[in-house]
Amino acid sequence: MGSFLLCLLLVQLQWCLCSNVLDDLLQQTNIAFLSQQDVIGVIPVNQIPLVGVELCSMFETVGDGQDTLAAMLQTGVQTLVMDIGYDEDAGGWQMCGRTSLSEGISTVSRQIERLFPTLYANLVVLVLRGGAAEAHYEALRDAIGRVGRWTYSAEKVKATSPHLNSLLDDQEKRVLVVALDDSLCEALGTVAFGPEDVAYVEGNDTIDCSEHTDSWSFIEREFHWTDVREYVRLGCSPVITGKSVANISELEALVKVAQVWSWGAGEPALTDANSEMQRCASLGYDSATERATWKSTSCRQNLPVLCQAVNDRYSWLVGTRNLRFDQLNMDSCPSGYKPSVPRTPLEQREVERYLSEHHPSDGQYWIYLNSISVEKCWVVGGPETPCPYVALVSTRNFAAMIVTSSILVLLLLVLIILLDLVRVPIQDNRRSWKRALGSYSKAETEGVPM
């Protein structure tokens, strides 16, 4: 019995230790990226900024092979730009003239499947360059078809304009295909976006990404930590070349810098689990740089709210009253506007432009974003908005569970101590019983006739 109770105690203690480990992992999670994904989830997929790599030059720098391709996807890369061609000697399509396109696409499919049930499931855009002879069209379709389970056709995107959450969660699709060559586009048919559907420039060529609000604006060049986020902020989707990094670790760091365009450095601040002080978000405007970033803020502060036009994503105003976060509602904004948060880099750029013209001094404004319901889970809306990532109990219920578990642990510990220290009467009488049985056996032996 004591051993059984000890096992129960160990299981309980192990649960507590696992909770600590999970909490440590949460501390390491890219909370800024997850919250940004939630914010951008209602934007049409072909208007979402992406961070990608040019595979051929990247293979030259960090090495080629399927493991390298998988590692790139694990860093958070969302766009794979690849030069492809049909190799007569190999009898199939090749990627960068060195590896099988079919094998590369299979690697992409496996990596998507591995990340499918996780928080980091994301969109992957395959951008294909090269020429295709009609005789090899079917082989190309077969190669791209290896990721067909996850592919959403360009034809459907154009017809329905699905937002990111719909594509990832409702449709359970992850892949879009872009063909930058007319012959590739013809080979893939309605599956792929054509060269007329996107803007794509290389090297020192220039592009005004803000003019292409209904499609991706890719810019391929050498990027560094100091400039890559600026391109994203302007609405561009950077394609990082191999000259930008020396290894996978540097690529991962550069991708992370590029992906988070919203929060300021060191934000959102990690607060005490029992504190609700820094669980609301504000937008801070720096007049010197004319830049705005998000920051975690005490929900009890009185600030004006940032308002977005109901029918125009790029029209913004500042409310006239200073309010606490829990006081925000439709009445906090002028007619035709609502409390909101910039959901894309271009929306935030319009906020900066508006503030520079109408509120040119440094300022701080509420945005409709908070983590009041669940710590570290930043969601768009008011204090009662639930966390979309995981189903969690409230802080009060969680505290009640901890108290109950602690009491059970204490009771089990007391029982184990009692069983070890207090003798049971049957155990105390065991020697007496042995003596009685011994005497009886001896008497019975002595009574046997000779």
From Swiss-Prot:
Per the UniProt record, which residue ranges are transmembrane? 398-418
Q: Keyword check for Membrane, yes or no.
A: yes
Report which residue ranges the record marks as coiled coil: none
Keywords, ordered alphabetically:
Glycoprotein, Membrane, Signal, Transmembrane, Transmembrane helix
Glycosylation, residue list: N204, N247
Recorded hits in InterPro entries, A to Z, give: C-type_lectin_CS, Telomere_Capping_Maintenance
Q: Which first-to-last residue range defines the signal peptide?
A: 1-18
Q: Which family does it belong to?
A: Belongs to the MTC6 family.
What the protein does comes down to: May be involved in telomere capping.
- Protein name in the entry: Maintenance of telomere capping protein 6
What's the encoding gene here? MTC6
